[in-house]
Amino acid sequence: MSLLVVGVSHRGTPLSLLERAVLDSDQATKLLDDLVGSPVVREGMVLSTCNRVEIYACVEKFHPALTLISELLSRHGNVNFDEIAGHVHVHYDDRAVQHLFAVAAGLDSMLIGEHQVVGQVRDAFRLAQERGYAGRDLHAIVQDALHAARRVRAETRIDSAGQTLVDVGLQILSERLGPLAGRRALVIGAGAMASVAVAALTRVGITGLTVASRTLRRATALAQRYNGQAAALEKLADLLAETDVVVSCTGSVHPVVDAATLTKAVAGRTNPLGILDIALPHDVDPDVDRLPNVIRVDLETLRPVLENTASSADVRHARHILDEEFDAHVARRAAVGVVPTVVALRDKAARVVAAELRRLEKRLPELDPRQFEEIRTTVHRVVDKLLHAPTVRVQELAGLAGPDSYSEALRTLFDLDPAQPVAISAPQPSTDSPARAAYQPTDEAATDAEPRRDDAEPPSAAAAQDAGRESRP
């Protein structure tokens, strides 16, 4: 079982195209249902943010899964796959795992080191768990990626400035408008990014804050935390006329602020209105750029500014940590790979002991039950002690050199049947789900991953080229 990642991101994809490819929550859920409901994908999750749309799938075969994902992106997205094919990145097996590690750590973000993406990865995985699509393999990979991200954040200064996209955007606005302290601000949206925006605006010293959202309850809860006011989105035209700075981040698939509404709002203004649109797709119609006294900053504006936000030393340190964590992940995966053979060995030993005890019972019927039970206990204890050290050691060695050679050695030495079923728990088909039932151990129990399939079918260069370019994480 190998991990396959197919997606588009801010790296190499025009934002005008990326904003059309972004999936809303309903689209992502439906795509996930069809993905894991297919016979070619066992586990999966969908990560859709303002920076990327990526499908993560645990698969046996590369080519059928790649074809399926391409079809699903066209079926559930807002863009035909042919339009984005030249921008698609494809990662497989170890490269796919390394890519997820980099994404979770913020090293593949538009703002290097930003930590909102950790929550986005966690949310994507949680949805997969809730729908029964996160089994042992995906669980191990995601938990190791989140652990690696925590190490990067704790051991480097890659996000020491605490900057977010909003912080950088407000800096650009202040360069064009002048200091933002003392100005009135309007935040459109009430989700996680809106909360980040409100905090950033508070730090720069705005004096009047209004949060507008379709869900007034959420807007009120957010505004009250910062002594602001809440308003319904229906009052947007009036709110725009009364504010100096707007930060919009709704996640709507259609523009929230159109040129006609803003034309009325800025009529007669003498001071410019600053707009920071960090939504993808755009919340604010780009046509507003032609209006007088309107200064708009969006993700396209931010992209070149964000390229050099983290120091090269911090990035190198972070990548070194990710390399260490990836090596540890591979070692754990390899150690688990020898477990079926170890279980088969212990199972054979138990069957041999049981047969010999039955033979002894027939040959010495004069033994009373107490004596026979003492013999049984002693024999089991001897066998357990003989097997304990080598089976523990073989798992340690497999973690260093891979499971295949040690598994083969055990099977040869003890004449184990490689096809013999062993008692290892695994995700089972769910009667109420088209995919595998969820496997939900604790978040830190990331060592139950199945063995890495070194003989899994590798992606051909032609297939990767057909789907897009294969990029390094």
Swiss-Prot record:
**NADP as a keyword?**
yes
One Pfam match, given by its short name, reads: GlutR_dimer
State its Enzyme Commission number(s).
Answer: 1.2.1.70
Judging by the UniProt lineage, the source's domain of life is Bacteria
| Residue stretches spanning the membrane | none
Q: Per the record, what are the reactions this protein catalyses?
A: (S)-4-amino-5-oxopentanoate + tRNA(Glu) + NADP(+) = L-glutamyl-tRNA(Glu) + NADPH + H(+)
* Site annotation Important for activity: residues: H99
Q: Where is the active site?
A: C50 (nucleophile)
Q: Which class of enzymes does this protein belong to?
A: oxidoreductase
Chain sites annotated for binding substrate: T49, C50, N51, R52, S109, E114, H115, Q116, Q120
One GO MF annotation is: NADP binding
Question: Its Gene Ontology biological processes?
Answer: protoporphyrinogen IX biosynthetic process from glutamate
Homology family: Belongs to the glutamyl-tRNA reductase family.
Please give the record's comment on domains: Possesses an unusual extended V-shaped dimeric structure with each monomer consisting of three distinct domains arranged along a curved 'spinal' alpha-helix. The N-terminal catalytic domain specifically recognizes the glutamate moiety of the substrate. The second domain is the NADPH-binding domain, and the third C-terminal domain is responsible for dimerization.
User: What is noted besides the main data?
Assistant: During catalysis, the active site Cys acts as a nucleophile attacking the alpha-carbonyl group of tRNA-bound glutamate with the formation of a thioester intermediate between enzyme and glutamate, and the concomitant release of tRNA(Glu). The thioester intermediate is finally reduced by direct hydride transfer from NADPH, to form the product GSA.
Family annotation (NCBIfam families): hemA, PRK00045.1-3
What's this protein's name?
Glutamyl-tRNA reductase
Q: Which organism is it from?
A: Acidothermus cellulolyticus (strain ATCC 43068 / DSM 8971 / 11B)
Q: Which gene encodes it?
A: hemA
